Every structure is written in C-alpha cells, then in structure tokens.
C-alpha cells in the first residue's frame, strides 16, 4: 500500500547540535529505521502542544538518556521525499551529563567539524554542517 504524504502540513522536527570542546555528537540511525545507518544530529518530532525546546529535551532524553542545555536555534530547513515531509529546526546544545545510553541508534561518534565530510548524513543534516 502506498503511503500518502501531506505536502501542505509538514511535520516539525528538532535536532540537537551537541558540542563539547571542538567536537560534535553524531548519531548513527538504527539499521531497521528509515534512512538506516546514516548519521544525524539526534532529535525527533515535535508533539502537539510542545515547544521546540521541550521536544528536543524529551527526544534527547529518550534517545541518549541524557539531559541537555539548549542555546540558540541556528537553522531551519525543509525536507520532503516520498516518505516524509518535515521542517527541521536545528539548535546548538551541550550535555548536562555524559552518561549516554543509546536506545534508538546504532552508535555515536564525537567528530570534529573538518571531519563531517567523512560521514554519510541523512538529507538536511549534511547541509547544515556548513553553518556550524
């Protein structure tokens, strides 16, 4: 059965650009998920009646089991393909604690900005790296 995409009302998605010293946290998507094994800045969908920052805090706690400090929004990008229609909202963040436990990703890496080109990013996230 073909999945229908609502092109009029994209879904808001938030992503955390988590920085520690000169490194950024990248997460490798689960192999069984859409765009599996690609790298991304972690985050997820904004739920009804949730602010972007509330959604980002919740998603990072669910996915990485850590709390974050959220600073400024640095970018917004729209992405649409045959499966999804989203507006991605990117925020600079830092970890409050470093006891990361993965629940939805295959792996994480701390990566220097100049090494981003070595990673196969999900669409959208790769474009944002030039703004960091």
Regions picked out by a protein language model, each given a short descriptive name:
Residues 2-24, 45, 76:
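Conserved N-terminal beta-strand and adjoining loop/helix that marks the start
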Residues 92, 101-132:
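NUDIX/MutT-family hydrolases
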Residues 67-69, 77-99, 109:
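Active-site-adjacent beta-strand/loop module that shapes the phosphate/pyrophosphate-binding cleft
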Residues 23-62:
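Conserved Nudix-box catalytic region and its N-terminal flanking loop in Nudix hydrolases
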Residues 18-19, 26, 93-95, 110:
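Conserved hydrophobic "DFG−1" position in protein kinase catalytic cores
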Residues 52-61, 73, 91, 108:
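Hydrophobic packing within well-folded, soluble alpha/beta domains
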């Amino acid at each position: 059965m073909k999945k229908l995409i609502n092109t009029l009302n994209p879904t808001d998605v938030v992503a955390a650009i988590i920085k520690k010293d000169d490194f950024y946290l990248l997460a490798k998507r689960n192999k069984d998920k859409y765009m599996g094994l690609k790298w991304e800045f972690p985050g997820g969908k904004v739920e009804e009646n949730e602010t972007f920052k509330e959604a980002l805090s919740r998603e990072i706690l669910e996915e990485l089991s850590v709390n974050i400090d959220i600073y400024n929004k640095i970018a917004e990008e729209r992405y649409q393909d045959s499966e999804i229609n989203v507006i991605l909202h990117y925020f600079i963040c830092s970890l409050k604690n470093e006891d990361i436990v993965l629940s939805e990703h295959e792996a994480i890496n701390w990566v220097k900005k100049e090494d981003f080109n070595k990673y196969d990013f999900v669409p959208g996230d790769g474009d944002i790296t030039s703004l960091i």
